[in-house]
């Protein structure tokens, strides 16, 4: 079977309901040369058809990236498969979810495992890695520029104290932000962070490639920081947006209180979801004035169809 570089293969997770133990969620990535990405995609697809797994894995010539969820056996199976494929230096983190965090299992074939749109060499040139303790010491300094490399809606859910929001909607916009806003700071200490670490592999590589002198990033990203840092020692404020059914997590990588507006994708605090502007799957205070009544009617129809499908599965 042949796949184009933009092919997406979807496989419905074979088990709709999970055991009472809940779902193990594994976030992983590694930059590593993959000689035949399409072949790896197909073999992954063959594997996930046989186990109880949901989520997304992205395969490219530069490596693998993704988040998957399943029972303990399924997670161990996919983890061992990737180790056997030579991904033995993965940035790998586990957490848990009481509910199924993804609807489907997707194996995507792309040009990049995280899309920056600018050629960089994260296997050869990256910033200085810092563990949580070192990170706290660095970002407490006055001579450090702290940048959140994530998107605007992620920043909204929570960030590190004093972090700059580049106001990007996608990671592709980050190189333009660097060009416009950071060029004059090449001699400054730059500290960057993201959810799991992968975007900073590329963003720090980009800055070093552009001539920045001192570039640092949080090893393992926010998720590792929240896993290892006690709340009373933490410089994190709010919750960390995640791309699954949990919406956001907090210290200990426990599910947070934010929910997602399924009309616009923005995270909402309990106070925001209690406002009259919020209608599940239809609107929130951030998008209610950005859609027409016809669009809202379509969203309501979609929600009715989703609810009917759920009732049918019960």
From Swiss-Prot:
Domain Rhodanese: 140-234
Enzyme class: oxidoreductase
Reaction it catalyzes: uridine(34) in tRNA + AH2 + O2 = 5-hydroxyuridine(34) in tRNA + A + H2O
Molecular-function GO terms, alphabetical: oxidoreductase activity, acting on paired donors, with incorporation or reduction of molecular oxygen
InterPro entries in the record: Rhodanese-like_dom, Rhodanese-like_dom_sf, TrhO, TRHO_N
UniProt entry keywords in alphabetical sequence: Oxidoreductase, tRNA processing
EC number: 1.14.-.-
The organism's place on the tree of life at top rank: Bacteria
Protein role: Catalyzes oxygen-dependent 5-hydroxyuridine (ho5U) modification at position 34 in tRNAs.
Similarity comment: family membership: Belongs to the TrhO family.
PANTHER family: RHODANESE-LIKE DOMAIN-CONTAINING PROTEIN 7-RELATED, THIOSULFATE SULFURTRANSFERASE/RHODANESE-LIKE DOMAIN-CONTAINING PROTEIN 2
Protein name, as recorded: tRNA uridine(34) hydroxylase
Species this protein is from: Acinetobacter baumannii (strain AYE)
Gene: trhO
């Amino acid at each position: 079977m042949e796949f184009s570089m933009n092919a997406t293969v979807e496989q419905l997770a074979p088990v709709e309901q999970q055991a009472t133990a809940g779902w193990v969620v594994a976030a992983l990535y590694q930059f590593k040369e993959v000689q035949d990405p399409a072949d790896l995609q197909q073999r992954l697809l063959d594997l996930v058809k046989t186990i109880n797994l949901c989520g997304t894995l992205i395969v490219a010539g530069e490596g693998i990236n993704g988040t998957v969820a399943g029972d303990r056996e399924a997670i161990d199976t996919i983890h061992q498969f990737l180790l056997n494929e030579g991904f033995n230096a993965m940035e790998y983190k586990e957490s848990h979810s009481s509910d199924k965090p993804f609807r489907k299992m997707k194996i995507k074939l792309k040009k990049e495992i995280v899309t920056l749109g600018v050629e960089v060499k994260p296997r050869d040139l990256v910033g200085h890695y810092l563990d949580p303790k070192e990170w706290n010491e660095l970002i407490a300094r006055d001579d450090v520029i702290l940048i959140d490399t994530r998107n605007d809606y992620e920043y909204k859910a929570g960030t590190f104290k004093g972090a700059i929001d580049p106001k990007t909607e996608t990671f592709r916009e980050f190189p333009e932000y660097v060009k416009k806003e950071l060029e004059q700071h090449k001699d400054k200490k730059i500290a960057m962070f993201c959810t799991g670490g992968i975007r900073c592999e590329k963003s720090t590589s980009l800055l070093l490639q552009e001539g920045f002198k001192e570039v640092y990033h949080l090893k393992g990203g926010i998720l590792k920081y929240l896993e290892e840092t006690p709340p009373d020692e933490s410089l994190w404020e709010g919750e960390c947006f995640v791309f699954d059914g949990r919406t956001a997590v907090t210290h200990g990588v426990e599910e947070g209180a934010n929910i997602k507006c399924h009309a616009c994708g923005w995270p909402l605090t309990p106070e925001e979801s209690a406002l009259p502007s919020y209608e599940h799957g239809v609107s929130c205070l951030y998008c209610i004035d950005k859609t027409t009544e016809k669009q809202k009617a379509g969203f309501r129809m979609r929600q009715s169809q989703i609810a009917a499908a759920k009732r049918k599965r019960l």
